[in-house]
């Protein structure tokens, strides 16, 4: 069978697709199916990714439901946990750096200064990452 990292990534993507379609119940179902509610501490990104993705999806669900502070708290917690991990080379694990997601969230909420801070922070760990660079370009206009 698939490992926890792959399962969590799949449910995360399913949850995001559901949110983008406005289907909150499917997004919540993906979050529930993902599991990973329990706190985990490891230096291994693939061990930590399910927890990070759970916090990220839960935060995005809260944001879609209009609970801005809870969304920032959950995604901020994911960013802190990811920030405690050693830097790695290669594709992002999980699929989106949590600092970038936090920047996207601040941008969506109209907080340009915090968005810029987290895009820049994301680029310190993922040099040249296109989505973070695009976020900074969007802020410049």
Task: Annotate each PLM feature.
Residues 32-40, 76-87, 121-124:
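Amphipathic alpha-helical segments of tetratricopeptide repeats
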Residues 9, 13, 50-53, 57, ...:
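"A position-specific structural signal for the A-helix of alpha-solenoid helical repeats
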Residues 3-6, 45, 49-51, 89, ...:
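Residue signature of alpha-solenoid helical repeat architecture, marking inter-repeat boundaries
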């Amino acid at each position: 069978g698939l490992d926890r990292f792959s399962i969590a990534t799949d449910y995360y993507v399913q949850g995001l697709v559901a949110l983008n379609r406005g289907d909150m119940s499917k997004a919540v179902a993906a979050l529930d199916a993902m599991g990973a509610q329990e706190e985990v501490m490891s230096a291994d990104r693939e061990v930590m990714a399910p927890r990070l993705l759970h916090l990220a999806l839960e935060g995005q669900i809260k944001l879609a439901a209009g609970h801005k502070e809870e969304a920032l708290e959950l995604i901020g917690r994911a960013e802190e946990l990811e920030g405690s991990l050693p830097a790695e080379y290669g594709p992002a694990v999980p699929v989106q750096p949590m600092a970038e997601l936090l920047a996207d969230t601040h941008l969506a909420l109209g907080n340009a200064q915090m968005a810029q801070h987290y895009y820049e922070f994301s680029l310190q760990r993922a040099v040249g990452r296109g989505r973070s660079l695009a976020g900074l370009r969007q802020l410049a206009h």
